[in-house]
Amino acid sequence: MHTIREKSKLLARVRRIRGQVEAAERALETEKGCAEVLHLIAAARGAINSLMVEVLEDHIRMHVVDPAKERDNERAQGAEELIDAVRSYLR
């Protein structure tokens, strides 16, 4: 599995996300205002989307085509465009 080389980095991100979700849970339990709860949820969602982008980009580079190593310029450009599209959609 290619994510093993980044395992500690990915796990740290997941743990931060867990902390954000737990903060949202505490805010709901203590009946904080809607704006605060929404802010906490939005932060967790952003963190999850960023994690998704990182894992998808790694997957594309490791299992589909690595634009930096691809000799076929059209495939390399297509891979870069796919990575850019994923980034812009999920951020």
Predicted segment positions?
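Solvent-exposed interaction patches of small proteins and small membrane subunits
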Residues: 1-91
